[in-house]
Amino acid sequence: RMGIGDMVIFLPFIEAISKSFKIPVSILVKENSKAIQFLRENKTINQIIILDRNNKNKSGRHDGIIGAYNLAKDLKKYNFNKIFIFNSSFRFNLIAKIARIKGIHQYPLFNKKNQHIIDAAKNFIKKELNIETESNPQIAINDKLVKNSKFNYKINHEEVNILLGVGGSGPTKRIPSKIFINFMKLVTQKYKCRFFLATGKDVEEQKILHEILNTQYKDKCIALDDLSLSEILPVIKNCDISICNDSSFSHLSSGLGIKTIVLMADTPLLYGSYSTKMFPIIPDGEITVKHNTLGKEKINPNTIFEQFNKIFN
């Protein structure tokens, strides 16, 4: 699976396997899943093995035919007895066999089309382990790190500490700065607030960040873009509520148990609604959202504020 969001979504299913066999498990993930940075406190995961595949130029150690052999050779060293493959790829099935893993559990082969990311995983775990799994991921975090973060950032719960996840992996997911700024105007009229701004280093993400910082609210803002993900997590855990684009921060925030308003502009609604901690907002005039909805300009700051009030009160 590709990124942070996918990694968070699959956590309950990984944990179900661990609990079924009463041992921690190893996971094979891509580096951009950032699993090493946010799963270090997860007691059901023993080892994080990095899948070295480069989708752009196919130059990774595990790319191509030779890469498949390399991966099989790498996995063989661990002497795994079982493998659970959360996709329908024949390639991974063959790799598991070459690695001499006897117990191969996998989605139905060649059945990727229109595959529901959550339902497919639920059905898989039910079929293989007879376990009903709730899609409600939880990310474990060290309490000491949370306390240190609270001290370092002088976080005071007499004011409302709000995470604003203003970044996003693609331009159609990034809600314009004016919408966040208008929300900030509304919320500061009623509440005493601090805003923690989470984003990446992409040029367009930085533009949105600096447009927000170049407002009357700049003294109420703390930018988190120079921190590593593992440094950001304790800050998020100290927040009272989050408002995030459909991005890694919406998944991480909800996984940390923070009620998260997810601004859904251009991806299927399930990515912003699979957790009980998620409260999706869709563009004005739409009854749902999916790929190519292209609705980022139609996210209404008044609707965000209304949802904020419902949650916070």
Predicted features by range, described:
Residues 1-313:
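Catalytic machinery of carbohydrate-active enzymes
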